[in-house]
UniProtKB/Swiss-Prot annotation:
<dbReference type="Pfam" id="PF01076">
    <property type="entry name" value="Mob_Pre"/>
</dbReference>
<feature type="binding site">
    <location>
        <position position="44"/>
    </location>
    <ligand>
        <name>DNA</name>
    </ligand>
</feature>
<feature type="binding site">
    <location>
        <position position="114"/>
    </location>
    <ligand>
        <name>DNA</name>
    </ligand>
</feature>
<keyword id="KW-0614">Plasmid</keyword>
<dbReference type="GO" id="GO:0003677">
    <property type="term" value="F:DNA binding"/>
</dbReference>
<feature type="region of interest" description="Disordered">
    <location>
        <begin position="331"/>
        <end position="361"/>
    </location>
</feature>
<keyword id="KW-0238">DNA-binding</keyword>
<dbReference type="InterPro" id="IPR001668">
    <property type="entry name" value="Mob_Pre"/>
</dbReference>
<comment type="function">
    <text>The interaction of the RSA site and the pre protein may not only serve a function in plasmid maintenance, but also contribute to the distribution of small antibiotic resistance plasmids among Gram-positive bacteria.</text>
</comment>
<comment type="similarity">
    <text>Belongs to the plasmid mobilization pre family.</text>
</comment>
<protein>
    <recommendedName>
        <fullName>Plasmid recombination enzyme</fullName>
    </recommendedName>
</protein>
<dbReference type="GO" id="GO:0006310">
    <property type="term" value="P:DNA recombination"/>
</dbReference>
Length: 361
């Protein structure tokens, strides 16, 4: 049994121009690759004549019928558009008249519950892969107050999902509602079509895999008789539980056993080796990460120490007119190492004293 599909989107004033161009096929360049323009003449509007220009005519209908004299907010939802359809197999069982009746029946359900005049368009597209209807409803309540949030609240949507399939079924269409799922996400048209293409791809891969499995099974069936060829044997005279075979057959059996054992051993060896390599790689990545973090920590520490040494050097120079030994600055990375001739033993002793005792005051 097929499913009745009903999905709603909210349209504001800024959306109506683009939606109108799409629904009424007013442009020749379509972003939707599923549209077959050679079949666009088969499209029809079940409430033809109510809306020619989506934005202008729908805004005019709202202004003429709303109870309040205040202007409609710019960000208000003006239309709740419902896309009504089912699956392709369902429509393939219907002729054109039955297909039209399916959409008329669905439209009548909404007319009975939300007002026929509030349905400003009900465009059926027959030029795409699966027939479907775009039906725009102005969300007026009984007091002619515009409120999409109140008219199509969560409770109302649940009623529609329950009642519409039953209504269609009572009118002769073999459909059922989809599975209940509170966490189900409503997909946009591009998302839905992308998912549909992904499903087609998966189905193709499934068929290819099944074909490969069938081919592999056929090859195994052909190999099996050859691998299990009958070896001429005869029981020994002294022991019926033992048989004798020709030397050539025995050698063939031994060779097969050796080959099989070697293959299995090599396979296991490679699997163990791969597992070991994966472990080594994982450990190396972990160690590399730890080293990077340690290097970052040390670099920060070096930067801090360099700052302290630089401040001390500047303080001594400013207050006492002296500086830290150049050797200290070189070791701290604050000065390039000097390239001087080898120092005398006295100078070496002096530098050693500097390193141990600090600057001479």
């Amino acid at each position: 049994m097929s499913f009745a599909v009903a999905r709603m989107t909210k349209l504001k004033a800024d959306n109506l121009v683009g939606i109108g161009n799409h629904d009424q096929r007013k442009t020749t360049n379509h972003s939707n690759e599923d549209i077959d323009v050679s079949r666009s003449h088969l499209n029809y509007d079940l409430v033809a004549g109510r809306t020619d220009n989506f934005k202008t005519d729908i805004e005019a209908y709202i202004n003429e019928n709303k109870a309040s004299k205040r202007a409609v907010r710019k960000d208000a939802v003006l239309v709740n558009e419902w896309i009504i359809t089912s699956d392709k197999d369902f429509f393939e069982q219907l002729d054109e008249a039955e297909t039209r009746k399916y959409f008329e029946t669905a439209k009548q359900y909404f007319a009975d519950n939300y007002g026929d005049e509030n349905i400003r368009y009900a465009v059926v597209h027959m030029d795409e892969k699966t027939p479907h209807m775009h039906m725009g409803i102005v969300p007026f309540d009984d007091d002619k107050k515009l409120s999409a949030k109140r008219i199509f609240n969560r409770e109302a949507l649940q009623h529609i999902q329950e009642e519409l399939p039953q209504y269609l079924k009572e009118n002769g269409f073999d459909v059922q509602r989809g599975n209940k799922n509170k966490e189900r996400k409503n997909l946009s048209v591009p998302e839905y079509k992308a998912m549909r293409e992904e499903l087609k791809k998966i189905e193709t891969e499934k068929q290819e895999t099944q074909a490969k499995l069938a081919d592999t099974k056929k090859q195994l069936d052909e190999i099996k008789p050859r691998d299990t060829k009958k070896i001429a044997s005869k029981p020994t005279l002294m022991n019926k539980n033992k048989v004798t075979v020709d030397k050539s057959d025995l050698a063939d059996l031994e060779q097969r056993a050796v080959t099989s054992d070697a293959y299995n051993f090599e396979k296991i060896h490679l699997e163990v080796g791969n597992h070991s390599l994966r472990n080594d790689l994982s450990e190396a990545k972990g160690r590399n990460y730890e080293l990077r973090k340690e290097n970052e920590r040390l670099q920060k520490l070096v930067g801090t120490l360099q700052g302290i040494i630089r401040n001390v050097d500047e303080f001594l120079h400013k207050k006492l007119g002296i500086n830290l030994p150049e050797k200290w600055l070189e070791r701290a990375g604050l000065k390039e190492p000097s390239k001087k001739a080898p120092e005398s033993s006295q100078e070496l002793d002096r530098h050693k004293s500097d390193e141990l005792g600090g600057p001479h005051l």
